[in-house]
Amino acid sequence: MAFDTKLLEIIACPVCKGKLRFDKENSELISTAAKLAYPVIDDIPVLLENEARELSLDEVQKWNS
């Protein structure tokens, strides 16, 4: 089973409450507003700030383009 992208319509970044985008290649949910990437483990998003990694400036720019 794969991550259900329909979830993106109802979940939000827990830090900034903004929209999340799915990075299929890295299996992460991306919040450019909070500059965080949340892992998706076994098709389950882990929306905990302490589990997220910080996005680099280059990554933020990539996702915003």
Curated annotation (Swiss-Prot):
SUPFAM superfamilies assigned to the protein according to its UniProt record, in alphabetical order: Trm112p-like
Domain of life: Bacteria
Short name of any one Pfam family annotated for the protein: Trm112p
InterPro entries linked: Trm112-like (IPR005651)
Recorded GO CC terms: cytosol
PANTHER family, per database record: PROTEIN PREY, MITOCHONDRIAL, ZGC:162634
Record family assignment: Belongs to the UPF0434 family.
Protein's recorded name: UPF0434 protein PSHAa1659
Species whose genome carries this gene: Pseudoalteromonas translucida (strain TAC 125)
